[in-house]
């Protein structure tokens, strides 16, 4: 349920001890994205891919999932890199703009992705990026074009994994046709956390 309801600390009884410094996570992972990142339809928050990624990597996490409003604004990118409380990050790009692209040209979407990724790329910390996860789409031509735009900029500037590599199974998508179900969230986490672990280990070994 945490961190979405008020929690009142009433105290602790019995023999207890605060965790030692070496028992706490040494790094923090920040995740930006849509309601999928936020954890919608993952049953409970510890089932969302962000929590599972952090668990697999043994790190703390900051979930900046914005339901319906992950619009990749340049201002948001500047805010993310201004924060000094994370060591590596992930950005999920595209799904919240899929309908909006009907109202403005793809060139506007491309300019937004260009500026967003350019800001993130200037920060030395590792940023993992992905495009649309698999979902039941009525306009595959438009979505394919948007996927290619995300790939063009993110693959050059960030640590990119196509969303279809993380989730491309209709049986793991919920009844709304957009959000992964609990098993879908698990698959995203299993695949992406493995990529993250290998990439971060290689960077540490340099």
Segments and roles (model prediction):
Residues 74-206:
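Alpha-helical cap/lid subdomain in secreted, periplasmic
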Residues 31, 61-63, 160:
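Conserved beta-strand scaffold positions in the cores of enzyme catalytic domains, especially
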Residues 27-50:
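Catalytic nucleophile-elbow at a beta strand-turn-alpha helix junction centered on a G-D-S/GDSL motif
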Residues 50-62, 152:
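Short helix-loop-beta junction
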Residues 1-29, 193, 197-206:
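N-terminal secretory targeting modules
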Residues 47, 51, 144-147:
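Short, surface-exposed alpha-helical segments at coil->helix boundaries
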Residues 35-40, 62-68, 95-107:
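Surface-exposed cleft-lining segments at the edges of enzyme active sites
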Residues 59-72, 166-167:
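Short connector loops at secondary-structure junctions
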């Amino acid at each position: 349920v945490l961190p979405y309801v008020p929690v009142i600390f009433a105290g602790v009884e019995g023999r207890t001890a605060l965790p030692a410094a070496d028992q706490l996570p040494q790094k923090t992972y920040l995740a930006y994205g849509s309601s999928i990142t936020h954890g919608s339809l993952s049953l409970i928050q510890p089932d969302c891919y962000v929590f599972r990624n952090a668990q697999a990597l043994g790190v703390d996490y900051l979930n900046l999932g914005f339901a319906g409003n992950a619009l990749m604004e340049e201002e948001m990118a500047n805010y993310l890199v201004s924060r000094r409380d994370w060591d590596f990050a992930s950005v999920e790009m595209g799904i919240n703009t899929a309908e909006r692209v009907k109202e403005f040209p793809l060139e506007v979407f491309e300019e937004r992705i260009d500026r967003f990724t350019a800001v993130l790329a200037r920060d030395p910390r590792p940023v993992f990026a992905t495009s649309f996860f698999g979902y039941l789409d009525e306009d595959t031509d438009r979505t394919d074009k948007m996927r290619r735009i995300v790939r063009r900029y993110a693959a050059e500037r960030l640590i990119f994994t196509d969303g279809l590599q993380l989730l491309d199974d209709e049986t793991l998508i919920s009844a709304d046709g957009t959000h992964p179900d609990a098993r879908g969230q698990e698959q995203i986490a299993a695949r992406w956390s493995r990529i993250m672990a290998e990439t971060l280990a290689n960077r540490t070994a340099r």
